[in-house]
Design a protein with these regions (language model features):
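Non-catalytic connector elements of ABC transporters
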Residues: 237-239, 249-363
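Conserved coupling/switch loops of ABC nucleotide-binding domains, chiefly the family-specific signature
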Residues: 56-59, 209
Length: 363
């Protein structure tokens, strides 16, 4: 049985429709990240599920029961919103303990649970401090601890790592999934950070303009985005999109890039004779100086070393800028200048230029 089920959920404000007929089913114990650009409706969705806002249409089912009209306090949800909403006159300890106190937990139980979640979120040293003495990151983690301390069956987290410094944010990306799974809660986790969504979610629901564009595992979304809109949201540098007009031949589809004929393999014939966008992730491009190895000519404009890889900014003969991301010693010595870029057709994506929809085979 799904712990959270949304059916045709819609919400509009005076400025226009924010959510448009959302359907989503989240299984017990699953972590689903709601990911999308700013203004997509992510926080509004959490507020509807929490009961803070009312939907204009559709239904919300929690643990198999229709909770669309249920009062917030009767939904059994742990919540951590972006604005923290901490009690200003209470210590971090008492803020975290507030839900446990409301449920009549013993003093020993309260201390044990608060100490446990505070240690996991690295805020044990500030438990005696009031919110005014906490940094934004500490406030955010205190709100997160409060959401988890009472062991709710459903947890809603609204960008809980947004105000956390870079080092701790990286650590929490690694630790949060284990923490959330240990709580046995079903989690909806809102974020604008695609890396965070991929690291934490069992699945990702990509919300664009009030609609779920794609709901799938992180790997599926990265390798097989259903549209240009989804593809652009994942990856840094982002996906290269090269306008092409593929033609069918004896060896399958081919196209012209930067004045060179490039094979697309036998699996992409659906795009023949149409204006398409060839989608190439930067890491799928191999750059070399030897024309005999195949590929299409480019000019390497800039080389940026980044840890153990280099990011190459290149320009085709048509003037389009594309990126390649490569690891290896040879890239440390690469200089700007003429080169050739090639790719494995099996890793290429094809999008209809007019609709943006992905067509044909997907990696």
């Amino acid at each position: 049985m799904a712990q959270i089920e949304l059916k045709s959920l819609s919400k509009a404000f005076k400025t226009g429709k924010v959510l448009d007929g959302l359907d989503l089913s989240v299984e017990e114990g699953e972590i689903v990240c709601i990911f999308g650009p700013s203004g997509a409706g992510k926080t509004v969705l959490l507020r509807l599920i929490a009961g803070v806002e009312e939907p204009d249409a559709g239904a919300i089912f929690l643990e198999g029961r229709d909770a669309t009209d249920a009062a917030p306090e009767r939904r059994g949800i742990g919540i951590a919103f972006q604005n923290f909403a901490l009690f200003p006159h209470m210590s971090a300890f008492d803020n975290i303990a507030s839900a446990l106190t409301a449920h009549g937990a013993t003093v020993a139980t309260i201390k044990a649970k608060v100490d446990k979640v505070a240690a996991m979120l690295k805020i044990s040293h500030v438990l005696n401090h009031e919110p005014r003495a906490l940094s934004n990151g500490q406030k955010q983690r205190t709100a997160l601890a409060r959401a988890l301390a009472a062991d709710p069956k459903i947890v809603l987290l609204d960008d809980p790592l947004r105000n956390v410094d870079a080092k701790l944010r990286y650590e929490m990306r690694l630790e949060l999934p284990s923490l959330l799974r240990a709580s046995d809660a079903t989690v909806l986790y809102v974020t604008q950070d695609y890396k965070e969504a991929m690291a934490i979610g069992d699945r990702i629901a990509v919300l664009i303009d009030g609609r779920f564009e794609q709901v799938a595992t992180p790997a599926s979304i990265y390798r097989a985005p259903v549209s240009v809109g989804v593809a652009r949201l994942f990856g840094d540098p982002t996906i290269n999109l090269i306008p092409v007009n593929p033609q069918a031949g004896g060896d399958g589809l081919s196209c012209e890039i930067s004045g060179a004929k490039v094979g697309l393999g036998a699996a992409q014939v659906e795009g023949a004779g149409r204006s398409m966008l060839l989608g190439l992730r930067p890491e799928s491009l191999v750059v070399n100086d030897d024309a005999g190895l195949g590929g299409f000519p480019v000019d390497v404009v800039a080389v940026t070393p980044l840890n153990e890889k280099s990011v190459l900014l290149m320009r085709t003969r048509d003037g389009q800028e594309i990126f390649a991301s490569e690891a290896g010693v040879e890239n440390e010595e690469r200089k700007p200048g003429p080169a050739f870029a090639r790719f494995d057709p099996a890793r290429a994506l094809m999008f209809d230029e007019a609709s943006g929809a992905c067509i044909g085979s997907r990696p």
